[in-house]
Amino acid sequence: MQETDDLLKTLNVKSLLEALLVYTPKGYKDLSLLERFETGLSGVLEVGILEKKNYAKVLKIFAYSKRFYKNLELVFFNHSAFYYNQFKTGESLFIYGKLEQSSFNQAYIINTPKILTEFGKISLIFKKVKNHKKIQENLQKLLSLENLKKEGVKENVARLLLEIFFPTPHFVKDFETNKNFPSQHLNALKYIEMLFYMKNLERKKLQFNAKIACPNNSERLKAFIASLPFKLTRDQQNAIKEIQSDLTSPIACKRLIIGDVGCGKTMVILASMVLAYPNKTLLMAPTSILAKQLYHEALKFLPPYFEVELLLGGSHKKRSNHLFEKITHVVIGTQALLFDKRDLNEFALVITDEQHRFGTKQRYQLEKMASSKGNKPHSLQFSATPIPRTLALAKSAFVKTTMIREIPYPKEIETLVLHKREFKIVMEKISEEIAKNHQVIVVYPLVNKSEKIPYLSLSEGASFWQKRFKNIYTTSGQDKNKEEVIEEFRELGSILLATTLIEVGISLPRLSVIVILAPERLGLATLHQLRGRVSRNGLKGYCFLCTIQEENERLEKFADELDGFKIAELDLQYRKSGDLLQGGKQSGNSFEYIDLARDENIIAEVKQDFLKNASVSQGTFEN
């Protein structure tokens, strides 16, 4: 056990699976003696040195193969004296290289061969590491059928992995011919990559006692739902039912609720507050605008006996002094909640809205502040960014996840992909909509001019709109007063010029047109969020994707689809999966081998095997 730990430490990894994924060979060097003298083959030859000649920048060593009795030339370009002195006339050496034939004189040649002191083995070639030999030794000490089985790898997959890390000459030849691993070996790497992912999820899953087990509150919930001026969708009702079960449990729940744009998750949030009553609920939103929206929705729809308070950064001291008195049932705020020193002991439920906008540490800090003596509050995390079905499949054994797919009323949004020469269509529609007292957002790809991007920036484009329309507002992520600008625009503006900061959650009831410049630079999930700003209250909506590209299949497919979950699947096909394990990056690929768009069968197989071998219960997430 100690030897294994020492080897893992030397490799700078924490588990055998991680070692296999970090140090998967990117190629092989077969140091076996060549079986035949044939151009195109790489391997080891024993050669006798006949003579050496220096031609300006080229050193030629004339030699012969002792096994095959063939003459050949060893060629070094831009050589140093070191190479010249390595080869002594009359001596024999073992060299490694690729046998080729000169197009000039048909002589057999090896360019820049390597002199060997030992041979007969197959060396693994790793990416971006220095001591290949030592890494190979340590890996091969760790690797065995027994150790792989201990990690939960089934035997047929384990044997394929052993072939990758203990390769035969035949395996190396196949690898070099195909420039990759055979398909069954690639599937073995996919298997352990998903197994490693699931083990990481399982490691985070910890159970804690709930600080407060809430009452059933069925009658109170029924009265709340009956008071609403609209009917809840089936998905909303199912989500509320799952949350009700969570909140009455003595185990602190942590549930992720994922809803499409406009699915009505605010009503699920308010129903959760009703279910927690008379205990207190704390809700954290990423911006003041969203916090205020939720506050006003709570005042509008929660029963009259609820006392709801709002805490924002810079709130007046006198007003915030009574926020946490016993009479308050719901506190809604921004990250200002994290810096408030009051006792949160009476809060049974902590809700994070647009949870992907917060870092793990921020979410954990809020939960920790509301914990008491090792007992935790119930925690609900809401997100309006649908995830692919395959990722949901992988997560579902470890994270309590609820999907809200149904939309209370179908949105009527027309999406058009337009070239800049067709911008007249956009201008005509903007004029029409402003005449109806509707609003428009124009999204620019960047704030200031850039030589690298062939589009106008926000600062360059502002004058174009200001000359043609009234009531123009401009803001960006760099604007310290952006929330005030957006709030004023909501009441008084016609056109808002902005960057993608308006992507999530902002409610603009009169907004009917969004114009997105350089849409090819954005992921489909971001485009879907931006488009989701229009048609919030039943207005006919228009989304114009204005590009300089003549054709873009990805944008055309997006234009034909309004379902956020289907767009999440589509997004996988056109971009790498993103850092889905950590929840941070939005591009790049956290999975090197698994393709979330195509490998559902492997994911299902790993999940089935893992649950069979591990004691996995529906617990909660630490982070």
UniProtKB/Swiss-Prot annotation:
It is an enzyme of class 5 (isomerase). Plays a critical role in recombination and DNA repair. Helps process Holliday junction intermediates to mature products by catalyzing branch migration. Has replication fork regression activity, unwinds stalled or blocked replication forks to make a HJ that can be resolved. Has a DNA unwinding activity characteristic of a DNA helicase with 3'-5' polarity. The wedge domain within the N-terminus inserts into the replication fork junction, where the lagging and leading strand split. It comes from the Bacteria. The keyword Nucleotide-binding applies. It catalyses: Couples ATP hydrolysis with the unwinding of duplex DNA by translocating in the 3'-5' direction; ATP + H2O = ADP + phosphate + H(+). ATP binds at G259, D260, V261, G262, C263, G264, K265, T266. This is ATP-dependent DNA helicase RecG. Its EC number is 5.6.2.4. GO terms for molecular function: ATP binding; ATP hydrolysis activity; DNA binding; DNA helicase activity. It holds the Pfam family Helicase_C. Residues 246-404 form the Helicase ATP-binding domain. Keywords: ATP-binding, DNA damage, DNA recombination, DNA repair, DNA-binding, Helicase, Hydrolase, Isomerase, Nucleotide-binding. Monomer. It comes from Helicobacter pylori (strain J99 / ATCC 700824) (Campylobacter pylori J99). Belongs to the helicase family. RecG subfamily. A motif (DEAH box) lies at residues 353-356. Residues 422-578 form the Helicase C-terminal domain. InterPro entries: DEAD/DEAH_box_helicase_dom (IPR011545), Helicase_ATP-bd (IPR014001), Helicase_C-like (IPR001650), P-loop_NTPase (IPR027417), RecG/Mfd (IPR047112). GO terms for biological process: DNA recombination; DNA repair. Residues 32-120 are annotated as: Wedge domain.
